Amino acid sequence: MAITKEDILNAVAEMSVMDVCDLVKMMEDKFGVSAAAAVAVAAGPVAGPAEAAEEKTEFDVVLVDAGSNKIAAIKAVRGATGLGLKEAKDAVEGTPFTVKEAASKEEAEALKKQLEEAGAKVELK
């Protein structure tokens, strides 16, 4: 009687991890193949650059420069973050400062507009 694939699978399931690694190495040597190549083929083709460039959904709003009107920038940062006056002043003077992390696109754009209206330079990352 021939050994079935299910018999082999059951035998491998009972082996320790080290024994399975040894078995894979022996199969690679015997058949002249690489298990890594088989995994890559099974995974399918790699996505092209167009597919890999998915649109970001979360943005970090970074204050790059407070501009000429630091008081307006401090007020805008306080309103956006809820920081106290001293903390907001330190943040504005210590640019670059991440005002908000992982904001939605709409929220990040609105915050950027608010800070730019106060005279600050802002980046979305």
UniProtKB/Swiss-Prot annotation:
This is Large ribosomal subunit protein bL12. The keyword Ribosomal protein applies. One of its GO terms (cellular component) is cytosolic large ribosomal subunit. Pfam families: Ribosomal_L12 (PF00542), Ribosomal_L12_N (PF16320). NCBIfam families: L12. It comes from the Bacteria. GO terms for biological process: translation. The keyword Signal does not apply. GO terms for molecular function: mRNA binding; structural constituent of ribosome. Belongs to the bacterial ribosomal protein bL12 family. Keywords: Ribonucleoprotein, Ribosomal protein. It comes from Francisella tularensis subsp. novicida (strain U112). Coiled coil: none annotated. Forms part of the ribosomal stalk which helps the ribosome interact with GTP-bound translation factors. Is thus essential for accurate translation. Homodimer. Part of the ribosomal stalk of the 50S ribosomal subunit. Forms a multimeric L10(L12)X complex, where L10 forms an elongated spine to which 2 to 4 L12 dimers bind in a sequential fashion. Binds GTP-bound translation factors.
